Amino acid sequence: MVEVKVLVEGYTNADSVEESGTEKSCPTITLVRDKNIVMVVDPGVLEDQQMLIDALKKENLEIKDVNIIFLTHSHIDHYRNVGMFQNARVLEYYGLWEKNTVDDWKEQFTNDIKIIKTPGHNYTSLTLLIKTEKGIVAIVGDVFWKERFPEKDVYADNASQLAESRKKVLELADFIIPGHGPMFKVEK
């Protein structure tokens, strides 16, 4: 069975940036392990590199052990640290990157890991649906910033697509790992 572990709990003050004057964000960085896959989802921003390295060490892993980086969407706060992972292939909206080539990804990545398109926040938004012992975990990027983020996403490319993507995720998932907060249970 697939193991899913939040390595770094994300944060953002984007919903209150007017009060502070400065926006600070780090995505929720997640580890996914399945057979020979050691995947990091949304490796984050430069100022949080050491926090990521330390979190991997707690899992008895080093940067070189990671073989796939999955990017939920193409916003820099989610992908800036991708260059740290020299041994990893990058899986994102346009495909699976190995050096300078890309192969189309398949909707069914493994038996227990499925990729779905969830546009709205960004047209490149993808969600991982992972079958675990606890149920289906959805790693959604900024489809949901955090559990109680306001309905209106001021950064959304397309609000109606985002609403549809959120609805789809809520129907499919038992737990959601949002873009900038702790995992939460879906109330059904």
Model-identified regions with their sequence ranges:
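Short beta-strand micro-motifs in enzyme catalytic cores
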Residues: 28-30, 114, 124-128
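Short glycine-/acidic-enriched loop or helix-start segments at secondary-structure transitions
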Residues: 16, 50-52, 79-81, 149-150, ...
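Metallo-beta-lactamase
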Residues: 123-188
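A short catalytic or substrate-binding loop motif that flags glycine-/basic-rich loops and adjacent residues
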Residues: 22-24, 119-122
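Active-site neighborhood of phospho(di)ester-bond hydrolases with catalytic His/Asp-centered motifs
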Residues: 41-43, 65-75, 81, 91-94, ...
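Active-site HxH/HxHxD metal-binding segment of metal-dependent hydrolases
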Residues: 20, 24-26, 44-111
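Beta-strand-turn-beta hairpins that frame and shape the catalytic cleft
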Residues: 1-4, 33-38, 106-114, 131-137
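Zn-dependent metallo-beta-lactamase
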Residues: 1-36, 167-172
